[in-house]
Amino acid sequence: MSVQIIPFQQQLPFLGSHLQSMRIVFRRDHPDVSALNPAPIQVPMNDGSGDVMTGIIHTPAEQRFPGLLLVAGHGFGGSAQSAYTRWVTKFFYDLGFAICRLNLRGAGNSRPLCRNNYHGACGDDLIRLWAWLLTAKPPAVPFRVERTYFMGASLSGSILANALAKIDNTNICAPSDLKGVIGGLGICFPFDMAAAVRKIHSVTNWPYLKYFLSKIKPLFAA
């Protein structure tokens, strides 16, 4: 599987990292996608933990590419309800793509179903998700998934990179179960996790650190 790096291009008026990070605060324009033919799914991790990831698959009446399922992942502290996850869902659904809004392990409504939490190196969770999607049958899924493509924003992009690095040598499932994984897209994700930690602890980023801590504390209190 080849890798292509596409340079990030800023768009007015959101220039610089701070304005880009705060865009969803300034502009509450994320769409309501709850009525877009939703079908909830539950994905058992099958790793002895009993954990279950959850998601919502939105299937257009006329699929542009039958059998193809896009999957949208969220960042740290997010869920299937995150603004950018909903933007991506609405955009591709309107183009005729079936798309799944995913709750990573312990996120969103998967919290009471999980003992563990997602992190940047949990690529095995995506491999389990792919294997499940590509072998599941209705009514567990709304249609037979033959191909899947993952789009990961922020931390879920890191998880995607971790998964793709392992996919050729995994012992989680048979290689044939993963033939339908056609690729993935990581968007603005931390590749060097140590550098990302140092950056978020810098003086100018303390509001973000405070926000992230407020998101992570309930996970460990649960």
Name each model feature, range by range.
Residues 14-62:
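N-terminal cap/lid segment of alpha/beta-hydrolase-fold proteins
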Residues 76, 98, 103-107, 190:
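Short beta-to-alpha linker loops that shape the active-site pocket of alpha/beta-hydrolase fold enzymes
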Residues 89-91, 105-149:
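Catalytic nucleophile-loop/oxyanion-hole region of alpha/beta-hydrolase
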Residues 83-101:
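Short amphipathic alpha-helix adjacent to the substrate-entry channel of hydrolases
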Residues 66-75:
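Short beta-strand element of the alpha/beta-hydrolase
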Residues 139-140, 144-222:
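Alpha/beta-hydrolase-fold enzymes
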Residues 86, 90, 127, 161-165:
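Short, hydrophobic alpha-helix immediately C-terminal to the catalytic nucleophile
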Residues 41, 71, 100, 149-151, ...:
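Hydrophobic/aromatic beta-strand patches that form the interior of the parallel beta-sheet core
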